Amino acid sequence: MTERVQVGSLQVAKVLYDFVVEEALPGTGVDAETFWAGADKVITELAPKNRDLLAKRDDLQAQIDQWHRDHAGAPIDAAAYKAFLQEIGYLLPTPAEFSVTTANVDTEITSTAGPQLVVPILNARFALNASNARWGSLYDALYGTNAISEENGAEKGSGYNKVRGDKVIAWAREFLDAAAPLASGSHADSTKYVIDGSELKITLADGTVTTLAQPEKFVGYLGAKDAPTSILLLNNGLHAEIQIDASSPIGSTDAAGVKDVVLESAVTTIMDFEDSVAAVDADDKVVGYRNWLGLNRGDLSEEIKKGAKSFTRTLNGDRKYTAVDGSELSLHGRSLLFVRNVGHLMTNPAILDADGNEVPEGILDALITSTCAVHGLSISDANGPLDNSRTGSIYIVKPKQHGPEEVAFTTELFGRVEQVLGLPENTLKVGIMDEERRTTVNLAACIKEAVDRVVFINTGFLDRTGDEIHTSMEAGAMVRKAEMKKQKWIGAYEDWNVDTGLACGLQGKAQIGKGMWAMTELMADMLEQKIGHPKAGANTAWVPSPTGATLHATHYHRVDVFAVQDSLKGKPRASVDDILTIPLAPSTDWTDAEKKEELDNNCQSILGYVVRWIDAGVGCSKVPDIHDVALMEDRATLRISSQLLANWLRHGIVSESDVVSALERMAPVVDRQNEGDAEYRNMAPDFDSNIAFQAAKELILEGAKQPSGYTEPILHRRRREYKAANA
């Protein structure tokens, strides 16, 4: 039984109450009585509005379902369908031209294009690693991944392989030629880097002394001018540091003594309370809130054990250099942090209202994460030496919003939280995830509702695909999952997001972002493909690891995103008609083998993720697929897989017994993939009593009934069931 404290009309879990009063509030200038009185008022007045918005979602979905049932068996009349969506208020008029007015935004958002990490906040080690991933070793990223082939004697091996190391060095030199080319010759032939007055001079193997083709790209150094230990370059707004130490193991093999090239990598990071975590009660939430508080105070630390050794990981300080003019140059040593709150759907038992109902978790997150973030403001006396924002802003990503009314509710909520905390109006900035269909088709109207708060729009094609399937659940059978990325709507959706963001004046004020690279081990493929994101005009895109951030950073050196955006302005490429094209399968005559393959692939993915969510409380996992390729799975990928199978079940492509058979076939596969985990409990053969297996089955068989196809209601209930059974 949860111990609670009565505060006004609220019943607050004691673990949360104590955290807020004893840890989060001290140093903010807000006393406990003021905070809780304000929180009580916000929850009491806004929770009914939250419920009304969810009811509207259900009402619109019911009308869409009925329209498709009424038109079953006939090809969809695109014009009639669009008119219907307008008639019911799903598709709204585009607002008159406007530009956002967001102010006091850090340069990492306004003028620096680069990678963005997304990290589960419940894991302190991951959170620290991500915060410190502002800078990363290019040599390590290349050597330790498949970015460099292991062919021709270049295997990673257990010790240092000079053949592989030389390939890494050659790749890095080619990168330097692209990012900061020489006036003549190549960095590959460099034998010495020195500073002559205020100019970088490079000696080549043939004795030639040259300079940078664009001398202004040299911005700082460390060490003596005639023997620098670091050369700091700036290209497309991102820094790259050539580190020199001829006595080091790597530097001793390099003609110029270069031991590494360190890149500014994860410029921004989202600390996630949503899809990558499993937080179902007050205890879970407080773990995340405490980590978020520690990041903002600058005192989060974690004891790391590697074999017999252990060390304490903390946040990195700022990086100091000598500028070209001889003054001190200080660069931020940590990623600029956003926090992703949950959406509007779920409630959480951490606080009960006057009627004993769980309060909306999104309201809870807004109140508590904002309180913690006050400590990260450089204008606040609450922060430690390591502040987050230097412009006085708190950056909150708000996911899974459906249309402009819901964005308006978020901005109202943020305004109310500012009043509780005594913060200036518009301190709380919002990142709008464009991952629900009603937000996509009304994106300009959504942005307008946050015209003075928006700092970010981002396509989340995973969740967006889940909503695409669920919205048109009754329309017919959808294409197979692997075919979804080839459908007309998805390309239009990606272009529409950039086009709309630019038309609304986001350039120079906010990020226009793209989604996650999920194949964590396939970095060579990422290097080849993910450059498409900056080329599409996105000034940030998601990566799954610090290493991925460093490699993706090279793309922003090769592509001037702001120049790309300039070329795209005023040239809309996408239409709402294309976005409204439902990805129905043109034919459903799949063979039995094809159906089995689709079932097995999706069931294996679902089980692999759900078993760790339910049993271990892990919300983001590297889950091997049926071919043992590691994929980063979170609730968004689960939503697609479960909704696709629910759709096929609804339209008779597969039967309930087919689904159950596939789950029972795949459970031993997942068990085998987890056999190295001593804590893991097998699902097979006792399927009926295994909570995780039953949750996976429910997600598919009941998928058509789930609100917007979301997985949270079933996952939360089943996780609490597991925790109670194993208390």
Curated annotation (Swiss-Prot):
Which top EC class applies here?
transferase
Reactions catalysed according to its record: glyoxylate + acetyl-CoA + H2O = (S)-malate + CoA + H(+)
Quote the record's binding site residues for Mg(2+). 435, 463
Q: Where does the UniProt entry say this protein principally localizes?
A: cytoplasm
UniProt keyword list = Cytoplasm, Glyoxylate bypass, Magnesium, Metal-binding, Oxidation, Transferase, Tricarboxylic acid cycle
Q: Which Pfam families match?
A: MS_C, MS_N, MS_TIM-barrel, MSG_insertion
For the ligand (acetyl-CoA), the binding residues are 118, 125-126, 276, 313, 544
Quick one: a GO biological-process term for this protein?
Answer: glyoxylate catabolic process
Zinc: present as a keyword of the record?
Answer: no
Concerning Gene3D superfamilies, the annotation shows: Malate synthase, domain 3, Malate synthase, domain III
- Which subcellular locations apply to this protein? Cytoplasm
Task: Spell out the catalytic residues.
Answer: 340, 634
Where is the PTM Cysteine sulfenic acid (-SOH) found along the chain? 620
Cite the GO molecular-function annotations of the record.
magnesium ion binding; malate synthase activity
Q: Tell me the pathway.
A: Carbohydrate metabolism; glyoxylate cycle; (S)-malate from isocitrate: step 2/2
**What EC number(s) does the entry state?**
2.3.3.9
Instruction: Enumerate the cofactors the protein uses.
Output: Mg(2+)
Q: Which HAMAP family does the record associate with it? A: Malate_synth_G
Family in the record: Belongs to the malate synthase family. GlcB subfamily.
Name the UniProt record assigns to this protein: Malate synthase G
Q: Which organism is it from?
A: Rhodococcus erythropolis (strain PR4 / NBRC 100887)
Instruction: Please state the gene responsible for encoding this protein.
Output: glcB
